[in-house]
Every structure is written in C-alpha cells, then in structure tokens.
Amino acid sequence: MNKELSIIVPMYNAERTIEKCLQSILGQTYSNFELLLVNDGSEDKTLQICEAYAKKDKRIRILSQENKGLIKARKLGVNAATSAVVGFVDSDDWIDADMYERMFA
C-alpha cells in the first residue's frame, strides 16, 4: 500500500524533545504515512533515540547528513519522500493525535 503522506522531521541535537515529538506523530489516528527523520549532524543522542524507534516501526526512515542547517535538512527529506503530500514537524514540536486525519477528511 502506498503511503499518502510523508512527514519530515529535521533534527539537530534534539535528545530532550524528540521522543515527545515522535510519540505525537506515531500516535496519529491517521496511519498511512512514512516518517522521515533527518539527522542534521546531531552530536547528542538524537540519532540513537530515533534508531530505537525505527526498529519498532517500519514507517520510519532515518536520513543523515553533516550539519548543514534546517533548510537543507528539509530539502533532503523532501527529495527522499515517496508521497505527493508532505508535512513538516519540527523536532521540538508535537501535534494533536487527529491532525492528519482532519487534514485528509
């Protein structure tokens, strides 16, 4: 089944906030999405936290690059996306559980 939505999360040293962000995305009532986590050269445990989540959920893909900034991290995610519809969530944000269900309603 093709995913209708690609959610891109650019990350840089987000170990304090990334778990709450990921939980809010993975807890969506709408589940037909891929989750692209773009590690922008984090020097903390951000990547390890994301790898643990990726082992548990096949919708997650991790992309990594040297630290190039938010815009280039988002662009890397967009270029890797397989869906026509793209959504962005920053690594220090979280979203309502029905956000994407409402978007596709």
Listing of model-derived features with the role each one plays in the protein:
Residues 1-105:
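Nucleotide-sugar donor-binding/catalytic module of glycosyltransferases
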